[in-house]
């Protein structure tokens, strides 16, 4: 039990590392005061370009993937695997290093689900890409893919604990996009540009 608790705390702290903020500061920019003010990959991409944006995406994704892979490697019961993934995600969304004001969690959730249900991720990515190509809104694509994940996990994994975790993560991703939803409804949301 002690090792499981240590893993969950470690997952939360790893998830809490503000990748986008650190990478932006390395090039002399406080990402919280530019663009949308969000520390996630989309704002970093828009503000600082493709290279730093992709580095942020990969870093945030690894924060979710690594703890889940460790839990899998230790052959922990499903409840601990789910709790570890959720802890990493919550670390990103509510980071202790920034007074619990983190990112929206899309990339970290991606990492968690790559470790838990790769087939669900492939299907969700297809939904994301289709939505992005058709409507050109990253936020809408993220929300749509997040909303689909619980159904995909239920269909593919059929494990109650993983389904519950995916519902919690999806709900928080959508909740963290509430300002984007308002802008989508008012027609003022930023369109994705390559």
Swiss-Prot record:
Probably interacts with PlsX. It is found in: Cell inner membrane. PANTHER family: GLYCEROL-3-PHOSPHATE ACYLTRANSFERASE-RELATED (PTHR30309:SF0), INNER MEMBRANE PROTEIN YGIH (PTHR30309). One of its GO terms (biological process) is phospholipid biosynthetic process. One of its GO terms (molecular function) is acyl-phosphate glycerol-3-phosphate acyltransferase activity. It is an enzyme of class 2 (transferase). NCBIfam families: glycerol-3-phosphate 1-O-acyltransferase PlsY (TIGR00023). Its EC number is 2.3.1.275. This is Glycerol-3-phosphate acyltransferase. Keywords: Cell inner membrane, Cell membrane, Lipid biosynthesis, Lipid metabolism, Membrane, Phospholipid biosynthesis, Phospholipid metabolism, Transferase, Transmembrane, Transmembrane helix. It catalyses: an acyl phosphate + sn-glycerol 3-phosphate = a 1-acyl-sn-glycero-3-phosphate + phosphate. Pathway: Lipid metabolism; phospholipid metabolism. HAMAP family: PlsY. It comes from Geotalea daltonii (strain DSM 22248 / JCM 15807 / FRC-32) (Geobacter daltonii).
């Amino acid at each position: 039990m002690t090792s499981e608790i240590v893993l969950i705390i470690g997952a939360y702290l790893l998830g809490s590392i503000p990748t986008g903020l650190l990478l932006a500061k390395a090039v002399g920019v406080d990402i919280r005061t530019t663009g949308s003010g969000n520390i996630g990959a989309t704002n970093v991409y828009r503000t600082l370009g493709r290279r730093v944006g992709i580095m942020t995406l990969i870093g945030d994704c690894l924060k979710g993937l690594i703890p889940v892979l460790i839990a899998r490697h230790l052959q922990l019961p499903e409840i601990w695997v789910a709790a570890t993934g959720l802890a990493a995600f919550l670390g990103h969304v509510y980071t202790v290093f920034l007074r619990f004001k983190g990112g929206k969690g899309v990339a970290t959730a991606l990492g968690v689900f790559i470790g838990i249900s790769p087939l669900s991720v492939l299907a969700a990515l297809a939904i994301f890409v289709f939505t992005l190509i058709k409507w050109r809104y990253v936020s809408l694509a993220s929300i749509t893919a997040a909303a689909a994940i619980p159904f995909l996990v239920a269909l593919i994994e059929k494990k109650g604990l993983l389904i519950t975790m995916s519902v919690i993560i999806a709900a928080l991703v959508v909740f963290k996009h509430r300002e984007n939803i308002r802008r989508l409804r008012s027609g003022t949301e930023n369109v994705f540009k390559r």
